[in-house]
Design a protein with these regions (language model features):
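Long, charged amphipathic helices and adjacent flexible linkers at domain junctions
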Residues: 292-309, 425, 460-491, 600-646
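A glycine-rich phosphate-binding loop feature that marks nucleotide/adenosyl-phosphate handling sites
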Residues: 189-196, 329-333, 387-392, 411-418, ...
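C-terminal accessory/binding modules appended to enzymatic or scaffolding proteins
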Residues: 14, 319-321, 484-518, 636-672, ...
Length: 768
């Protein structure tokens, strides 16, 4: 990596040069982000995963820039256009935009109006006009060019009049203005700073595009438009219902060009002015609009991806129930409830279908089936999917008078149907149908959400915002980073983990993970981390990256169950020897751990950060960083939207956090929306600062729209209630006030349109 890149990244991220340089070297050596953050703190100055990821991404961006720079230099050199001055300009371009602006005048292009004008011999006239000499008479100077013609590809172009000659000369000037780097920079800033995003309805699409009705005639400054509104407008355009533009005030755009290129008010200057007008309308304006739209689309994508990634992290790190014998129930009315019995390792032991809601006799049979499984297999928990018939099934189970020690927990079904039809599920359960696989997934999600959710494409989990509209490559990378981060943060039990979970461990991939599982199945459980080196395809580098994140209970070495890396076993052995005890004694005796003098073990490679991590691991080897599991129950007697009344205070769980608010499951088969204005009594700029996916809340029902099954909730201490049914012609005032039309309340920012239909569609898609 070039030294000037290190300096640039240092300045951009506010880090020390040595931190950036060390991280760059480690990444180049093949180290992963989790490994660097956990086991190379001394080299990086204790950078965290976020900082390391930022360095990694910026390095890749700068390397891409350098590749493009070399390509441009090569192209210019081959065409004998590369001067020392131009080489210096290309070399100094700090961004891809600046680089492309420099290259634009020299870029091979298709035949344009300007090239045709040049072929007609009008370039000398354009130069004369460009000079804007007050003594120049444009029409007089143009007269000698009348009648010029050129034939290209059997097509003849001719300038027959003075007006056509001047128009051709202006075409040359317009392209010259368009290619000017200063003009492009000036206009780019104007479009970004003062551009207005406008959307209008495509004629005849009122009914089809009703969900975008808020945008049928809408405009706002692009610089302050929330990401979800930009994405909503773009979605409406993509679906053919909206026409959108992003432009600054035209007078300012023209004024910028006039200021750069027009000198005075002579006839020649007027020709340059007309060329500026044409350039803005036909060339530069279009180009800058595309750039500005791309800029704000990327910005909106980044925000939406960040929201998705934050939500996914919270979901993956949700509290696990742990290894308990569990019943997983996928509820249903007509087709019955699919029940599976899982042992403490999540292995499927039995399955059957019960029909608790069809008749008294079948309900008794269902009760007997559940009670028998609980009694015979000593069931410790029951997981119920939160889809159709979930509350009814929960009520049925709770009527069985089960021991209070058995937790009955509602579990999100989001993505379960996708898993049940996946190749992974077919491999795991080739002899069982979709319904059984789905119920297994529900039960396992309660036991260990992380281990089960890694089997899904993160995009199918349902905690995103406009996830199908954003840059899919960027989304995938961000979500993959989150999954890798979470898996390695928690650590993986080597002898029980699935190959799907192992594949996300630092240093491993799907191939080496499959080899690990195959070796385990053939030779029995791993007895030590050192055995990993016997795996085909897993060399010393992969071992270095992976070993610390893999745990072996009751392994050959007492530290195999901890996050202490094998490269530090010798150090811990020395600590124990210096105290006259064993490593096992250090694990068991707090007094002995307290007696360790860390300063004695500091070396250039091992500093206090690593030593403190080691001692922390000795205190709680292999500790799970996830919070302790706490059972949650919805309010009894409130099982469907029709049961709700304004003013009810209900327990709920946050299921999705977006830029405009959060969705909360209150147990009625339909998530309610807590608009950003109703999250807190304090001002809320970013909902994610106040709420997380999986967070338990007490929500107040504000309004209910029964026909459309929409629920408005509030988390504020003082709530102004709306109607139970939608009312037209509300009283106005602040959003959510009593008597105001419900759909109007759901608009953004006190009346600014949002995509209410899209928002609620997101929630409705979660619940069958």
């Amino acid at each position: 990596m070039l030294e000037h890149h290190i300096v640039q990244i240092t300045q951009e991220l506010g880090l020390q040069p040595r931190q950036v340089a060390a991280t760059a070297v480690l990444l180049e050596e093949g180290a992963t982000v989790p490994f660097i953050a956990r086991y190379r703190k001394e080299r990086t100055g204790e950078l965290d995963e976020v900082q390391i990821t930022a360095i990694r991404d910026r390095i890749e961006q700068l390397e891409t820039l350098d590749k493009r720079r070399e390509s441009i230099l090569s192209s210019l050199d081959e065409r004998k256009l590369l001067t020392e001055e131009l080489r210096a300009k290309v070399a100094s371009a700090a961004t891809m935009t600046a680089l492309e602006d420099i290259y634009l005048p020299y870029k091979p292009r298709k035949r344009t109006r300007a090239t045709i004008a040049k072929e007609l011999g009008l370039e000398p006239l354009s130069e004369l006009l460009w000079a804007q000499d007050p003594m120049t008479d444009p029409e007089k100077e143009a007269a000698p060019f009348v009648g010029n013609s050129v034939t290209v590809d059997a097509k003849t172009s001719t300038v027959a009049t003075v007006a056509e000659v001047l128009a051709g000369a202006r075409d040359i000037l317009a392209e010259r203005i368009n290619d000017d780097a200063t003009a492009r920079a000036r206009l780019r800033s104007l479009y970004l700073e003062k551009g207005v995003m406008k959307s209008t309805l495509v004629s005849g699409k009122e009914e089809e595009g009703a969900k975008f009705k808020d945008y049928f005639d809408w405009s706002e400054p692009a610089a302050t438009a929330p990401s979800h509104r930009i994405l909503a407008m773009r979605r409406g355009e993509t679906e053919g219902f909206l026409y959108t533009r992003l432009t600054p005030p035209e007078t300012e755009a023209l004024g910028a060009l006039y200021g750069l290129f027009v000198k005075g008010s002579c006839p020649a200057a007027e020709q340059v002015r007309l060329a500026c007008d044409d350039c803005l309308k036909r060339l530069l304006g279009f180009s800058m609009e595309v750039e500005a739209r791309t800029f704000y689309k990327k910005k909106a994508d980044e925000e939406a991806i960040r929201v998705f990634a934050d939500n996914l992290r919270e979901l993956l790190l949700a509290s696990p129930l742990g290894q308990k014998v569990t019943l997983g129930i996928d509820p249903g009315f007509r087709t019955g409830c699919k029940v599976v019995l899982l042992d403490r390792q999540g292995k499927l032991l039995a399955n059957e279908v019960i029909y608790p809601g069809r008749s008294r006799g079948e309900e008794m049979e269902a009760a007997e089936a559940i009670l028998n499984m609980v009694r015979i297999h000593k069931v410790e928990a029951i997981a119920i999917g939160n889809g159709t018939a979930s509350r009814e099934t929960e009520a049925f189970v709770k009527k069985l008078n089960l021991p209070s020690s058995i937790a009955v927990v509602m579990v999100s079904e989001s993505g379960a149907s996708i898993y049940s039809a996946s190749e992974i599920a077919r491999e795991e359960f080739p002899n069982h149908d979709l319904t059984v696989r789905g119920a297994v997934s529900i039960g396992r999600r309660l036991m260990d959400p992380l281990a089960e959710l890694v089997k899904l494409d993160p995009k199918s989990i349902g905690v995103g915002q406009y996830q199908h509209d954003v840059d899919q490559a960027a989304l995938k990378r961000s979500l993959d980073d989150v999954v890798v981060s979470c898996v390695n943060k928690v650590g993986v039990e080597l002898n029980t983990a699935s190959r799907h979970l192992l594949a996300y461990v630092s240093g491993l991939n799907s191939r080496t993970a499959a080899s690990l599982v195959s070796h385990r199945d053939t030779n029995g459980p791993f007895k030590s981390r050192a055995e990993l080196l016997k795996i085909s395809g897993l060399g010393p580098k992969a071992f270095e990256q992976a070993a610390g994140f893999l745990r072996i209970r009751d392994g050959a070495h007492p530290l195999d169950a901890s996050a202490v890396h094998p490269e530090r076993y010798e150090l811990v052995d020395r600590m124990a020897a210096d105290l006259g005890c064993t490593v096992t004694d250090l694990l068991r005796d707090p007094a002995k751990r307290a007696a360790i003098k860390l300063d004695r073990y500091v070396t250039p490679e091992v500093g206090l950060p690593t030593l403190k991590d080691i001692v922390a691991e000795l205190a709680k080897p292999g500790r799970d960083p996830r919070e302790q599991f706490e059972a949650f129950s919805f309010a009894d007697g409130v099982e469907k939207v029709e049961d709700l009344q304004p003013g009810m205070k209900l327990p709920g769980i946050v299921t999705n956090v977006t830029a405009f608010g959060a969705f909360v499951d209150i147990g009625v088969h339909q998530d309610g929306l807590v608009h950003i204005s109703q999250i807190s009594d304090d001002f809320v700029k970013n909902p994610a600062d106040f709420l997380k996916v999986g967070q338990k809340v007490q929500a107040t029902v504000m309004e209910i729209d029964l026909p459309r099954k929409r629920i408005a909730l509030s988390l504020k201490t003082k709530v102004e209630l709306g109607p139970r049914q939608p009312r037209q012609g509300g009283a106005g005032g602040r959003p959510g006030g009593r008597g105001e039309d419900f759909s109007k309340y759901m608009r953004q920012d006190g009346g600014r349109p949002g995509t209410v239909n899209d928002w609620f569609s997101m929630a409705q898609q979660r619940k069958p």
